[in-house]
Every structure is written in C-alpha cells, then in structure tokens.
UniProtKB/Swiss-Prot annotation:
Name of the featured protein: Tryptophan synthase alpha chain
Record pathway: Amino-acid biosynthesis; L-tryptophan biosynthesis; L-tryptophan from chorismate: step 5/5
Recorded catalytic activity of this chain's protein: (1S,2R)-1-C-(indol-3-yl)glycerol 3-phosphate + L-serine = D-glyceraldehyde 3-phosphate + L-tryptophan + H2O
CDD domains in the cross-refs: Tryptophan_synthase_alpha
InterPro entries, per database record: Aldolase_TIM, RibuloseP-bd_barrel, Trp_synthase_alpha_AS, Trp_synthase_suA
Top EC class, one word: lyase
Subunit structure: Tetramer of two alpha and two beta chains.
Species annotation: Staphylococcus aureus (strain NCTC 8325 / PS 47)
Keywords linked to the UniProt accession: Amino-acid biosynthesis, Aromatic amino acid biosynthesis, Lyase, Tryptophan biosynthesis
C-alpha cells in the first residue's frame, strides 16, 4: 500500500500557490491551518506563521473564498486544521455547509473532546466532511477503541507528547502503539508532530500508513526557494515509498 504524505501549510496569502505546489509534488492530502489567536496545540513555528497570517488579515472567510475560487488548482484532497472556537463562532451548520461547498475533505480539530466530535459526526455527516480523529500516545486503550471504531478519513497519531515540530524524539512506545491501533482500524493510521527529515520518515514508515509534516514545511515555505522546497518534498516522497 502506498504511504500517505500529508504536508501542513498555514492558510495565508500564498495558500493556493503553496497548496498547488504541494499537490504537484507528491502530497496525497494537504492540511491547511486556519489562523487562530490562541493555538494551544501548535509549536513555535506554526504559531508564528499563524500570527503573521492574522496580521495579513487572513480569516476563515478568506480561506473559504480562496478555496471556492481556486480549489480546483489543488490536485489532491485537503483538510482544514482548525480550533473548535472558529467553528462555533461561524455557526456549526454554516461551517459544515461551507466546507462541503469549497471541497474540504475533512476537519482536524485538536481541541475537540471525543464526545463533541461524535455529536458533530452524527449531526452533520450528510455534508460528507470527515472529522479526523487524533490519538495521543497517552490515550488509554479503552478510549482508543472508542475513537478507532468511529474513525473516518484517517487516524492522526500524535507521535510526541510535546507540542509540534520540536526535537523529533519519538516516544519509545510509539511503534507498538501505532501497530495496536492499526490492528483494529478500518482507515489509514498516520503519524505526525515532530517529523522533519527523511530519517524520521524512514523510521516511522515501518509502522505508520503515512506521515504528516507541519513545522518543517512551514519553515521551508518561509525561507527556501521553490526549487529547494521541491527537492525536499521529493526526498520525503522517495523515502516514504521506497
């Protein structure tokens, strides 16, 4: 089975250009961050990118507008990574409608309690927008079974107990945990948080069905040339499916 490559970008003025480049260079699903003033799950790189986007005047309406106009340029699925506060403020039903209308494949909502995610799935499943489940290494086995039994799209395993993109030190129990999740899952199980290099990818792909890379991609879009970014993406893609 081909491993999934899921890069993350911040929703900013370059959203469509960056997403298009990723979709042309091996991305299977793109995670688009919605800037938020209090991003509790984000590491310093993504937090700074979010602050910059807010200064640029980027809002969820801007992101929806761009996806509505130019989403067909993105040649793969895309999901929104957003905090529940944004959905609540927008209005749950209006938000899910807009996601459907702008081609959003799914939502990653890091501060969403499991019980609330179940309500949203039941209430808004007819819009066809998947709510992606997150599993931390600290999640107990009973809760994992509950989460996995209702998972849709893919399962996002958080490979560190720290915030995103720090030192890349994977939890010693990580592989065992991912394997146990895969044994009971009906959707791909991907690993994210702290994955930056082809070496990290080679290590984690032994057990995971795919990887999410966030901070490193955001950093490279900020400071690298287009050619350097493409070269990096190719190195990840090569390692992932070698």
């Amino acid at each position: 089975m081909t491993k999934l490559f899921i890069p993350y970008i911040m929703g900013n003025k370059d959203l469509i250009e960056n997403a298009t480049l990723l979709s042309e260079n091996g991305a299977d699903i793109i995670e688009i961050g919605v800037p938020f003033s209090d991003p509790v799950a984000d590491g310093p790189v993504i937090m700074e990118a979010g602050q910059q986007a807010i200064k640029q005047g980027i809002t969820i309406d801007y992101i929806f507008n761009q996806l509505e106009k130019h989403g067909d340029q993105i040649k793969c699925n895309y999901v929104l990574m957003t905090y529940y506060n944004i959905i609540c403020h927008y209005g749950e039903q209006a938000f899910f409608e807009k996601c459907r209308d702008t081609g959003v494949y799914g939502l990653i909502i890091p501060d969403l309690p499991y019980e609330l995610s179940q309500r949203l799935k039941q209430q808004f499943s007819h819009y066809g927008v998947k709510i992606i489940s997150l599993v931390a290494m600290t999640t107990d086995d009973k809760r994992i079974k509950d989460i996995v039994s209702h998972a849709e799209g893919f399962i996002y395993t958080v490979t560190m107990n720290a915030t995103t993109g720090q030192n890349g030190a994977f939890h010693p129990e990580l592989k065992r945990k991912i394997e146990s999740i895969k044994a009971i899952a009906n959707v791909p199980v991907v690993a994210g948080f702290g994955i930056r290099t082809p070496q990290h990818v080679a290590d984690i792909k032994e057990v995971a069905d795919g990887i999410v890379i966030g901070s490193e991609i955001v950093k490279r879009f900020k400071s690298n040339t287009r050619e350097e970014i493409i070269k990096y993406l190719q190195s990840i893609q090569q390692t992932l499916n070698n």
